[in-house]
Design a protein with these regions (language model features):
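Short alpha-helical transmembrane segments in multi-pass integral membrane proteins
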Residues: 1-27, 84-151, 193-249, 305-370, ...
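N-terminal transmembrane alpha-helices
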Residues: 14-46, 50-51, 67-79, 83, ...
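Transmembrane helical elements of multi-pass membrane transporters/channels
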Residues: 25-44, 145, 179, 208-212, ...
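Helix-terminus/linker motif at the lipid-water interface of multi-pass membrane proteins
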Residues: 35, 39-57, 126-133, 189-196, ...
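Interfacial/gating helices of multi-pass transporter permease domains
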Residues: 47-67, 134-138, 198-201, 240-247, ...
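Small-residue-rich hydrophobic transmembrane alpha-helices
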Residues: 56-116, 153-172, 279-343, 374-396
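Hydrophobic transmembrane alpha-helices of multi-pass small-molecule transporters
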Residues: 68-71, 183-188, 213-217, 289-292, ...
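Short runs within selected transmembrane alpha-helices of multi-pass transporters and secretion channels
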Residues: 77, 146-164, 172-180, 201-214, ...
Length: 453
């Protein structure tokens, strides 16, 4: 029977609607949001790439900074979001407001600490993230406005996740899409019209994120949400902070390893000059676009898997996982084939430099081959996360950019030189796939047996 936090209508929708229609309808807003985010990341790469190879390399350096902000923001957002969702299910609005307030204001405070520390040590910070001496001025100019905006960016991630956990994903999408579109508009204006260079790209990102923050905050101030933000509701109990951290640890680990992996990639690439840093940065941004589609489809699976697993409709969980892998594979195949056929054109689009092309093209084609494995990797991880198998989910989440990637990026460049850097991510993806399959297949068989029992 449905629990008291779900209406009968929602129960029938989640347990009776045909799986393909249900998953695609739930995935559509997430795919749109993630595509917009990927597009404005590509826009940054495109516009900055018109300046110089060193400026293009700065995008990769600042990507690691953005990953740090996201790791902390997702930790507080996902950490509090699950608690808020369960509290509202128990009709405990006071607890929801307490955890919403605590996560929001704590994220803002942590963002302020990051901003002050980062600005005070900016050149050393950028070198730590993998900058070269020639990239450093561009990376510093790019990062400075983003660091100023870090408190708002981090708390925006908290608000975005609270809205999703309250079931108001469309409100979250409005803030995200508005910020993304504004970023695309402001980039050429600040970079070329106002001649601000990479600093203009950073300012465009910072301003668009501030607007997104205001839109998201307005949802809470206008009473569109159940949970509210009140300074007086910030908890003083260490146990509550530990609960937020424990719930948010998988997200923190995943995003944190993305940052560390990106930093190590930049450090390895800088031994071969600015063109290598720029080339690997361009590849990362292009394939993040393709990966965002697989992740978006996978996020359509999460509520379906969680609901039906809780309702003991295990065969629907199995059907949902298989369909999601198939749907994500179809989307990835189309995008991958288009990218493979236009590989040189795409790289030239972001930086028309023969040295950049020489580095990026082999890496591009290696990554194309490995992208076909992503649907299995993404769906396996998300399915386990959604049904509460947090140990397996955390292990798999840490594989791609952590357990598999970090040892490779520390060893292959010494053994193979530049080709070792170009091969690291595809090999890490292949290893993650090999690790994921033994988790996925037995569990799908187990779901059938559980249904029959």
């Amino acid at each position: 029977m449905p629990t008291n936090d779900l209406s009968q209508q929602q129960y029938h929708k989640m347990t009776e609607t045909p799986i393909p229609r249900l998953i695609l309808s739930l995935a559509a807003p997430t795919i749109l949001s993630m595509l917009i985010t990927s597009i404005y990341n590509l826009a940054d790469t495109f516009f900055v790439g018109q300046l110089s190879t060193s400026a293009s390399g700065a995008v990769g350096i600042v990507s690691s900074l953005m990953a740090i902000i996201q790791a902390l923001g997702f930790m507080f957002g996902h950490g509090a979001g699950g608690i808020i969702s369960r509290s509202l299910g128990n009709q405990d609005t006071h607890a929801a407001t307490k955890f919403a307030s605590t996560s929001f204001f704590t994220a803002m405070a942590v963002g302020a600490v990051l901003a002050v520390g980062g600005l005070a040590t900016l050149p050393r910070f950028m070198m730590l993230l993998g900058s070269t001496d020639t990239i450093l001025p561009h990376a510093s100019a790019y990062a400075r406005p983003i660091l100023f905006a870090a408190p708002l960016m981090m708390s925006s991630l908290v608000m975005n996740n609270i809205l999703r956990y309250e079931g108001k994903a469309s409100f979250a999408m409005i803030g995200l899409v508005t910020g993304g579109v504004l970023n695309i508009v402001l980039d050429p204006l600040f970079i070329f019209v106002f001649k601000m260079g990479t600093g203009g790209a950073g300012l465009a990102t910072a301003l668009s994120q501030c607007i997104s923050f205001c839109i998201l905050l307005s949802m809470f101030l206008r009473g569109k949400t159940v949970s509210q933000f009140r300074i007086t509701e910030i908890t003083r109990a260490p146990r509550d902070y530990l609960l937020i951290f424990t719930n948010g640890a998988p997200s923190f680990g995943r995003q944190g390893l993305n940052s560390i992996g990106g930093m190590l990639l930049n450090i390895a690439a800088r031994e071969y000059g600015d063109a290598a840093v720029a080339g690997m940065s361009i590849i990362s941004r292009i394939f993040l676009f393709i990966l965002s589609v697989a992740i978006g489809v996978g996020q359509g699976l999460q509520p379906v898997a969680a609901f039906n697993y809780g309702a003991k409709k295990y065969r629907r969980v199995r059907q949902a996982a298989i369909f999601t892998i198939f749907a994500a594979f179809c989307f990835v195949c189309v995008l991958n084939v288009v990218c493979w056929c236009n590989s040189e054109t795409l790289i030239h689009l972001f930086r028309d430099d023969p040295e950049v092309l020489a580095v990026a093209l082999p890496a591009f084609r290696y990554q194309c081959l490995a992208m076909f494995l992503q649907p299995v990797i993404v769906v396996t991880n998300m399915m386990f996360q959604s049904i509460g198998k947090s140990g397996r989910a955390t292990l798999l989440a840490c594989c791609r950019q952590g357990i598999c990637f970090i040892p490779l990026i520390l060893t292959l460049p010494h053994l193979l030189g530049l080709p070792g850097i170009e091969m690291c991510q595809p090999i890490a993806d292949t290893l993650t796939f090999v690790i994921s399959v033994p988790f996925l297949l037995p569990f799908l068989h187990k779901l059938n047996r559980m249904e029959e029992a």
